[in-house]
Curated annotation (Swiss-Prot):
<comment type="function">
    <text>This is one of the proteins that bind and probably mediate the attachment of the 5S RNA into the large ribosomal subunit, where it forms part of the central protuberance. In the 70S ribosome it contacts protein S13 of the 30S subunit (bridge B1b), connecting the 2 subunits; this bridge is implicated in subunit movement. Contacts the P site tRNA; the 5S rRNA and some of its associated proteins might help stabilize positioning of ribosome-bound tRNAs.</text>
</comment>
<dbReference type="GO" id="GO:0019843">
    <property type="term" value="F:rRNA binding"/>
</dbReference>
<dbReference type="GO" id="GO:0003735">
    <property type="term" value="F:structural constituent of ribosome"/>
</dbReference>
<dbReference type="GO" id="GO:0000049">
    <property type="term" value="F:tRNA binding"/>
</dbReference>
<dbReference type="GO" id="GO:0005840">
    <property type="term" value="C:ribosome"/>
</dbReference>
<dbReference type="Pfam" id="PF00281">
    <property type="entry name" value="Ribosomal_L5"/>
</dbReference>
<dbReference type="InterPro" id="IPR020930">
    <property type="entry name" value="Ribosomal_uL5_bac-type"/>
</dbReference>
<comment type="subunit">
    <text>Part of the 50S ribosomal subunit; part of the 5S rRNA/L5/L18/L25 subcomplex. Contacts the 5S rRNA and the P site tRNA. Forms a bridge to the 30S subunit in the 70S ribosome.</text>
</comment>
<keyword id="KW-0694">RNA-binding</keyword>
<dbReference type="InterPro" id="IPR031309">
    <property type="entry name" value="Ribosomal_uL5_C"/>
</dbReference>
<keyword id="KW-0699">rRNA-binding</keyword>
<dbReference type="GO" id="GO:0006412">
    <property type="term" value="P:translation"/>
</dbReference>
<protein>
    <recommendedName>
        <fullName>Large ribosomal subunit protein uL5</fullName>
    </recommendedName>
</protein>
<comment type="similarity">
    <text>Belongs to the universal ribosomal protein uL5 family.</text>
</comment>
<dbReference type="InterPro" id="IPR002132">
    <property type="entry name" value="Ribosomal_uL5"/>
</dbReference>
<dbReference type="InterPro" id="IPR031310">
    <property type="entry name" value="Ribosomal_uL5_N"/>
</dbReference>
<keyword id="KW-0689">Ribosomal protein</keyword>
Amino acid sequence: MLRFKELYQKEIISNLQKEFSYKNKHEIPAIEKIVINMGVGEAIADSKVIDKAVNDLTLISGQKPFVTSARKSIATFKLRDGMKIGCKVTLRKDRMYDFLERLVIVALPRVKEFRGFSYKSFDGKGNFTFGLKEQIVFPEINYDKIDSIRGMDITIVTSAKTDKEGKSLLSGFNLPFYN
């Protein structure tokens, strides 16, 4: 069994139960899914770049991402409706806990000058979104084989009703926060 899933079941649930005094066990917040989105602006000029981004995201997440397309044309960006401009993947269940574990234990300590996340990144409903500027913080990415540095947006969707519950849940997984 995965360590973070076990951590949630054995420790985090009881800590949240004590902190917020829930009456029903179904009220206890949990992580529902993790969405990783990689926007590839260079794909407008060169369509082969999207394949490399898909490959990087496949290595990071462990499953094949969905290629996203532009919804409407924007002339100033030379963007046409239907052009491939990024990729995203939704992780649930065991892959979600596996990714979260690799993110907290391996990837975040490798980010330069990283002090933690701000509480302002919560959306008001307990969901947490942040960005990473480079994909090379993940050990699955071979630094010698990448063509360019790409960032990504990571959204952790929880069943928490408030930001305080969401922060408490994610702090249980040792996600570093400041202020």
